[in-house]
Amino acid sequence: MQKEKTTQTRWRVKRESSMIAVIFEVWPKPDKKQKYLDLAATLRPILERIDGFISIERFESLTEPGKILSLSFFRDEAAVAAWRNVEKHRRAQASGRTEIFANYRLRVASVIRDYSMHDRNQAPVDSQARYG
């Protein structure tokens, strides 16, 4: 697996198999949002050192007040497992469950295509025929 820096996105991943998306939806308790964001910020430098980590972004829902989505990409399941088992991350998970989160949902998915307006290699054939 090689990473190649691009201007359109942080990383375009050349891969033999699909990368993994981790979609973490969290509803912090009303007075715990900042605590969650601070905790996530302390974990980020550790996450960035995980072999196979690609990127992470956080979004706040426009339609569901209080809901935050964290979208992470990893090279493979081994990278996800490495992150999941970092002891400081495990302690943060426990803290989230006991004091920060009202609820959360975690989805882990394989990325089946990865293309952009300018990098069309994995675009479906019909889309390539129509838009190049």
Predicted regions and their residues:
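Short S/T/G/P-rich N-terminal loop/turn motif that feeds into the first structured element of a domain
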Residues: M1-I68, E77-N85, F101-G132
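Conserved short loop/helix modules at catalytic or binding sites
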Residues: A92, G96
